[in-house]
Amino acid sequence: LREVCGLTTEEIAQAFLAAAPTLAQRIVRAKAKIRDAHIPYQVPEPHELAERLDAVLRVIYLVFNEGYSASSGDSVTRVDLSGEAIRVGRLLVELLPDPEAIGLLALMLLQESRRTARTSPDGELVLLGEQDRSLWNRAQIAEGSALVERSLASRRVGPYAIQAAIAAVHANAASPESTDWSEIVGLYDVLMLLAPSPVIELNRAVAVAMRDGPAAGLALVEGLLERGELADYHLAHAARADLARRLGRTADARVAYERALALARQEPERRFLGRRLAELK
């Protein structure tokens, strides 16, 4: 991520939910290991590709994520990163058509299909439920959906394929109201078995809120925050704030919005959170 893809230490730290100094030390140790073990910089032999695939997929995924939602700066997205991740993802599928490589390409295309609708003409953040779906890229949705089916048909289902299936449910819903939230929660349940993480739990909690109401989702989000793993993750506090707001718990919502605003580093997100906070006041 640092030396090949050019992400900054701060961007990588954000991706791993780690402090930047901690991440910097990991990079120093990794460089020392490469140097001391005389690990060569060369293309792996064909028989070595499969065992290295997971790491390659992870790198492509994290580069795409930084392009899809920039961790800092003046723009919601970075098309240079997401475009490069999709390009490399296509090459990987051609080289090694593994179900998870196919699933990752599907996920990226389905997420990228919403790019134009995710910001207003003046660059402000537009949430999923408020997006103009006529702006979504139907060609990317069709290609991504076909790749999801291809990956799932292999019967070797992994976390990227499941995330792509979730994205396909969103992408193929005609409206926010017609979204099949029960299916999305069920897919998150599968994803939690395959690749459990606090961020996946948070996403599932938001889906539960959409299916069962904000009180059900808020209980899950607050439980996650109490565990401490997402204490410095601004989107967890933003989710808590939104659900509390929808329940009329204005004081709790205000505190959570203030915490999210203090942690957010992307300017459009900060402006969005600031507007929500001002509405409460």
Roles of regions detected by a PLM:
Residues W136, R156, P176, M192-L193, ...:
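Structural signature of alpha-solenoid helical repeat scaffolds
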Residues A195-E201, A231-A236:
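Generic helix N-cap/helix-start motif at coil->alpha-helix transitions
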Residues L104, M108-Q111, Q163, A167, ...:
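"A position-specific structural signal for the A-helix of alpha-solenoid helical repeats
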Residues E3, T8-E11, A18-D189:
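Amphipathic helix-loop-helix modules that constitute alpha-helical solenoid scaffolds
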Residues E94-L95, A153-S154, V190-L194, L225-L230, ...:
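Solenoid-like repeat scaffolds
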